[in-house]
Design a protein with these regions (language model features):
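Short, low-complexity, Lys/Arg-enriched N-terminal segments of secretory-pathway carbohydrate enzymes
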Residues: 1-7
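Signature for phosphate-centric chemistry
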Residues: 7-208, 212-392, 396-512
Length: 512
């Protein structure tokens, strides 16, 4: 029989053995430890490995959650890291591309009651913003403003008691007023990109504004500009017209771009035709609304359904049903939430596959090169000390921002929601010392932000920039962006120029 002393010795030995095993596991990092256990320099790389390699793949996107994100309802305040950089850097310029704000649908569901939304701007209803009244008053003083081309014929405010197709809503106006006020805190107040009173010699500091030929993009730009600079001087404002939603300027002719777009559209069509849940949802909706399924598919019903969801309006019913429509479960002639979930789920999968597909990536590189090249030239002019606008605003669409994100290599970015923003910031090192990695004195650097998040080190041109190990700066060298635009964007086409890449036509059966 084991004595008490022997038991104590045995337990002591077991405890020592467990301690050795535990220390061994921790030495080889086979069990997790609190961040900071090994110190800051050791903890950060280990945390990155866990995120990039060992965590499980994210679950499927929830259609309702993603729809709430897409609507971007103006609740609370806008947050973001625009205008923030390490100590010792000075902001030289910021170029902002936005998607217009919330709008009325571009399509109508056949044989369904139309969505009724008031597009008048009124300060006595939601969503309200304290700058709304001043914005409306300032738009009435636009006689001295200059608007190029068709922009001169557009109203500066949405003003219909019942919205028209594609018209900006009051929600869309408030979204951009809020973004403008957020950017004002850093770009105007902190960094002085816009002076309160520009003199003739300081005209280069005025904002450059460009909009596509749609009222909703012009109105969105004006709302953001007012939030950024309340009561701006109309006599110094000129809004340039961009004829193409792709912002391709004089380089819109690109045969390969059209070919890649057609191939990607075929891929999308094949994927949708093979989705049994989507086909069932269209059959059920068509039966409820008493229309042929093919006609319903052609109407792109997810667009008007998203408008119902964003504005908290019940999904539509057949026009033959009484008004107001019957409550569930008697809504047999109506579009259901499950129909909406199915359509949105397929759309989210399609967006994800499109971002990851080589076809769309190549299309995006070609379609967005003119804009990125123009941006690089304008930022380069600022870096060289030449007369150039320090702040530029480009008002565009989802079909502009989505390929821009793909061209930059941001395959994981979410689809551009209403009032999405993509920002390019140019920074300069202020001190006179030589930068880490041998960069020139006074070197310039670039930051890329999407909806306020710094995504610079996720871009194709700077994802390999090692800022932590003394081989580079805390910011991405501007030269990397210049090299990307002038050289690296053509590499997937085995070309050395935009013209050559545009004539590198893919085979009709290509599946890259």
């Amino acid at each position: 029989m084991m004595t008490f002393q022997n038991r104590f010795v045995l337990l002591l030995g077991l405890a020592a053995l467990l301690a050795v095993i535990s220390l061994s596991l921790q030495f080889f990092r086979l069990i997790p430890l609190p961040v900071g256990f090994y110190g800051e320099e050791e903890a950060k790389p280990r945390k990155r490995v866990l995120i990039d390699g060992l965590l499980k793949a994210p679950q499927a996107l929830d259609p309702i959650t993603e729809s709430v994100y897409y609507c971007n309802r103006p609740n609370g305040s806008v947050q973001g890291l625009e205008g923030h950089a390490p100590v010792g850097f000075k902001l030289e310029a910021a170029h902002i591309m936005i998607r217009h704000g919330d709008r009325y649908p571009l399509y109508a569901i056949p044989n369904a009651a139309a969505l009724n939304i008031d597009c008048n701007i009124r300060t006595d209803r939601a969503p309200f913003h304290r700058a709304l009244e001043g914005f409306v008053a300032h738009m009435a003083q636009a006689r001295e403003g200059r608007f190029d081309g068709p922009l001169a014929g557009f109203p500066l405010l949405p003003s219909h008691p019942r919205c028209e197709m594609g018209q900006l809503t009051q929600t869309g106006v408030v979204q951009h007023l809020m973004i403008g006020q957020h950017l004002r805190q850093t770009y105007s107040d902190l960094h002085g990109l816009l002076l309160k009173h520009e003199s003739e010699s300081e005209r280069v500091r005025a904002a450059y504004v460009e909009s596509t030929g749609r009222a909703r993009t012009l109105q969105s730009a004006l709302a953001l500009l007012y939030g950024l600079r309340p009561a701006f001087d109309w006599s110094r404002l000129r809004v340039h017209h961009q004829p193409s939603a792709s912002y391709c300027y004089a380089a819109c002719e690109c045969p390969a771009r059209s070919a890649f777009q057609e191939l990607d559209q075929r891929r999308q069509s094949r994927a949708r035709s093979r989705d049994p849940q989507l086909a069932r949802a269209f059959r059920d909706m068509a039966s409820a609304l008493d229309v042929p399924p093919a006609r319903l598919r052609a109407a792109v019903p997810v667009d008007p359904l998203l408008a119902h969801f964003c504005h908290g309006v019940p999904f539509p019913c057949a026009t033959s049903l009484p008004s107001p429509p019957p409550p569930p479960p008697q809504r047999s002639g109506c579009v259901s939430e499950q129909h909406f979930r199915t359509l949105r789920a397929q759309q989210l999968v399609d967006e994800k596959e499109r971002r990851e597909a080589g076809l769309f990536r190549r299309f995006a590189l070609l379609v967005m090169h003119p804009f990125l090249n123009r941006t690089a030239q304008r930022l380069g002019a600022v870096a060289a000390g030449k007369p150039a606008e320090r702040l530029a605003l480009y008002s565009a669409h989802d079909v502009t921002l989505e390929p821009a994100l793909s061209a930059l290599g941001l395959a994981g970015a979410r689809f551009p929601r209403y009032a999405a923003r993509l920002v390019f910031e140019l920074w300069r090192k202020e001190d006179k010392g030589r930068l880490a990695g041998g960069a020139d004195v006074g070197g310039h650097f670039i930051r890329v932000l999407y909806n306020g998040e710094d995504v610079t080190f996720k871009t194709a041109f700077c994802q390999n920039h090692d800022w932590k190990r003394g081989t580079g700066s805390l910011l991405c060298p501007f030269q990397k962006f210049l090299d990307f635009v002038s050289r690296d964007m053509f590499a997937p086409f085995n070309s050395t120029s935009y013209y050559e890449a545009c004539h590198h036509i893919p085979q009709p059966d290509a599946d890259i």
